[in-house]
């Protein structure tokens, strides 16, 4: 049975905002937008976070060390963010960054274009259209550093977790903590859920959402949303997301550009 789950999240107002668009497609016809109704598409409402001046301590930003050059394997494709085709919030909150992904992954043509909600989205699939692993890059409005954002990360994570809970059957937030992506300090939460009634049965869903503050005192941070399903044979739990399978390439190669 065909199934589609769409999550559209936008956080704005006050100090912080974020936008992501993720499509988990257990199976979706490529030439039509019509899908069978079970499970029906789910779109979240738009939450808003209002941060008071006391929520964010204006601390001096500590600039992380310059990351070493990434040695890309022969089958890797580089994505370099560009402002050329962006409009709206993505143009307003543009960030220079790059990463590599395997050439067998599919680049989503709906990201990084006018009207898009993500700078980039790439996906590993089983034919014809079953998600195994997914990597999407969005943005959030930052106070300028990990130190300055630290006090509001738990609030932002709680708001996003509440939205995921409404959208994913069997949703559970598993953990929440500070993290690192290479030399960059960040904050993340991990979660589990299900994608039900697909033609391959009920699929386990595991996810990580990482906030990466800007490195040079800018106001635009990056969000990395990673999702995986039990169709990825190397993954057995949420702890494997970004550690096993093919997502590690994206985390290891992610680099901020000039801010």
Q: What name fits each language-model region?
A:
Residues 105, 143, 193-197, 230:
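Beta-strand elements of well-folded, non-transmembrane domains
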Residues 140-147, 159, 170-176, 225-231, ...:
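Low-complexity, flexible helical/coil segments
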Residues 120-155, 222-227:
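A short acidic-to-branched-hydrophobic micro-motif
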Residues 153-216:
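Signature of long, low-cysteine stretches enriched in small and polar/charged residues
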Residues 1-128, 178-181, 201, 217-218, ...:
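N-terminal targeting sequences that direct proteins away from the cytosol to non-cytosolic compartments
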Residues 98-100, 134-139, 186-192, 208-210, ...:
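Ordered hydrophobic segments in well-structured contexts
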Residues 100, 151, 155, 159, ...:
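Extracytoplasmic/secreted proteins, especially bacterial periplasmic and envelope-associated proteins
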Residues 90-91, 142-151, 175, 196-198, ...:
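Second-shell loop/turn segments in exported
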């Amino acid at each position: 049975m065909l199934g589609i789950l769409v999550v559209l999240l936008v956080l704005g107002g006050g100090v912080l905002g974020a936008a992501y668009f993720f499509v988990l497609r257990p199976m979706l016809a490529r030439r039509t937008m019509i899908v069978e109704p079970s499970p029906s598409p789910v779109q979240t409402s738009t939450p808003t976070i209002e941060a008071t001046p006391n929520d964010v301590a204006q601390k001096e930003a500590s600039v992380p060390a310059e990351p070493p050059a990434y040695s890309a394997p022969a089958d890797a494709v580089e994505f370099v963010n560009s402002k050329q085709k962006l409009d709206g919030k993505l143009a307003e909150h543009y960030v220079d960054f790059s990463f590599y992904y395997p050439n067998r992954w599919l680049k989503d043509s709906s990201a990084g274009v006018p009207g898009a909600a993500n700078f980039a989205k790439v996906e590993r699939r089983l034919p014809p259209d079953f998600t195994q692993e997914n990597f999407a890059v969005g943005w959030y409005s930052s106070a300028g550093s990990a130190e300055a954002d630290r006090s509001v990360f738990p609030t932002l994570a709680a708001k996003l977790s509440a939205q995921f809970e409404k959208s994913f059957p069997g949703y559970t937030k598993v953990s929440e903590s500070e993290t690192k992506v290479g030399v960059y300090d960040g904050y993340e939460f991990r979660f589990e859920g299900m994608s039900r009634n697909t033609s391959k049965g009920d699929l386990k869903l595991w996810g990580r959402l990482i906030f990466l503050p800007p490195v040079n005192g800018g106001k635009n941070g990056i969000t990395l949303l990673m999702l995986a399903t039990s169709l990825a044979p190397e993954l057995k739990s949420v702890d494997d997301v970004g550690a096993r399978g093919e997502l590690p390439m994206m985390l290891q190669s992610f680099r901020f550009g000039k801010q």
